[in-house]
Amino acid sequence: MKMSDNKQALQVAALKNGTVIDHIPSDKLFTVVALLGLQDSDSNITIGNNFESKKLGKKGIIKVADRFFTDEEISRLSVVAPNVKLNIIRDYEVVEKKQVLMPEELRGIVKCANPKCITNNEPMTTLFHVIDKEHGILKCHYCEKEQSKEGIKLL
């Protein structure tokens, strides 16, 4: 491509097969990497941050070769980056687009903020009910403590 073509070069290389996670808020990019355990992955991974975005101002993007995420993994994303979009790529073509949506329940993802909650004192899996998706309000199934997504700690 010549510079005189008046076209912009791709900032991130094309992906043959895998998943593109797009529209990640820039300040949440590395949280998403950690949530999905990508730091331990053997796949080729491209991570870009602070790309211009009309919706977010600045955004992050992650391209993971030959990896397709489970619904459980996608649910984890909804806690920190609820408006992320996933593009499923096969043979360089987008074959499916998924909007990350917060599920009705979050199991084993969030730590309860109540120090007296049984999940903080016994070896058991946490369970939260999402009572307000728009504002990210979660309620512990066991002690019924409510917490907002801004104050949560991930497991």
Curated annotation (Swiss-Prot):
<keyword id="KW-0665">Pyrimidine biosynthesis</keyword>
<dbReference type="InterPro" id="IPR020542">
    <property type="entry name" value="Asp_carbamoyltrfase_reg_C"/>
</dbReference>
<feature type="binding site">
    <location>
        <position position="112"/>
    </location>
    <ligand>
        <name>Zn(2+)</name>
    </ligand>
</feature>
<feature type="binding site">
    <location>
        <position position="143"/>
    </location>
    <ligand>
        <name>Zn(2+)</name>
    </ligand>
</feature>
<protein>
    <recommendedName>
        <fullName>Aspartate carbamoyltransferase regulatory chain</fullName>
    </recommendedName>
</protein>
<dbReference type="Pfam" id="PF02748">
    <property type="entry name" value="PyrI_C"/>
</dbReference>
<dbReference type="InterPro" id="IPR020545">
    <property type="entry name" value="Asp_carbamoyltransf_reg_N"/>
</dbReference>
<comment type="subunit">
    <text>Contains catalytic and regulatory chains.</text>
</comment>
<feature type="binding site">
    <location>
        <position position="140"/>
    </location>
    <ligand>
        <name>Zn(2+)</name>
    </ligand>
</feature>
<dbReference type="InterPro" id="IPR002801">
    <property type="entry name" value="Asp_carbamoylTrfase_reg"/>
</dbReference>
<comment type="function">
    <text>Involved in allosteric regulation of aspartate carbamoyltransferase.</text>
</comment>
<feature type="binding site">
    <location>
        <position position="117"/>
    </location>
    <ligand>
        <name>Zn(2+)</name>
    </ligand>
</feature>
<keyword id="KW-0479">Metal-binding</keyword>
<dbReference type="GO" id="GO:0046872">
    <property type="term" value="F:metal ion binding"/>
</dbReference>
<dbReference type="Pfam" id="PF01948">
    <property type="entry name" value="PyrI"/>
</dbReference>
<dbReference type="GO" id="GO:0006207">
    <property type="term" value="P:'de novo' pyrimidine nucleobase biosynthetic process"/>
</dbReference>
<comment type="similarity">
    <text>Belongs to the PyrI family.</text>
</comment>
<dbReference type="GO" id="GO:0006221">
    <property type="term" value="P:pyrimidine nucleotide biosynthetic process"/>
</dbReference>
<keyword id="KW-0862">Zinc</keyword>
<dbReference type="InterPro" id="IPR036792">
    <property type="entry name" value="Asp_carbatrfase_reg_C_sf"/>
</dbReference>
<dbReference type="InterPro" id="IPR036793">
    <property type="entry name" value="Asp_carbatrfase_reg_N_sf"/>
</dbReference>
<dbReference type="GO" id="GO:0009347">
    <property type="term" value="C:aspartate carbamoyltransferase complex"/>
</dbReference>
